[in-house]
């Protein structure tokens, strides 16, 4: 399932994104962030993180460096 979502984002990056001028306010870009978040946390949590990030990507937000949070494994 992860591969499908990451493939869709890669398709967007390859075929749709080049049609528009760069506008992401963040580093890494929102699409890079989404791919890394889904890869690290899975489809549900990774997509949720990506959606929250995309909602912050607007002209009134300063943007800047905003990496995917680290994965914290619980140790018993």
Curated annotation (Swiss-Prot):
ATP-binding is among the record's keywords: no
Keywords, in A-Z order: Cell inner membrane, Cell membrane, Membrane
InterPro entries: Membr_insert_effic_factor_YidD (IPR002696)
Keyword Cell membrane: yes
GO CC, one annotated term: plasma membrane
Record family assignment: Belongs to the UPF0161 family.
Role description: Could be involved in insertion of integral membrane proteins into the membrane.
Protein name: Putative membrane protein insertion efficiency factor
Cell location: Cell inner membrane
HAMAP family with a match to the protein in the record: UPF0161_YidD
Membrane topology: Peripheral membrane protein
């Amino acid at each position: 399932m992860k591969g499908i979502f990451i493939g869709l984002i890669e398709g967007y990056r390859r075929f749709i994104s080049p049609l528009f001028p760069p506008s992401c306010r963040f580093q890494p870009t929102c699409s890079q962030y989404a791919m890394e978040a889904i890869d690290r946390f899975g489809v549900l949590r990774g997509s949720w993180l990506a959606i929250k990030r995309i909602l912050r990507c607007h002209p009134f937000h300063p943007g800047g460096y905003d990496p995917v949070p680290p994965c914290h494994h619980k140790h018993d």
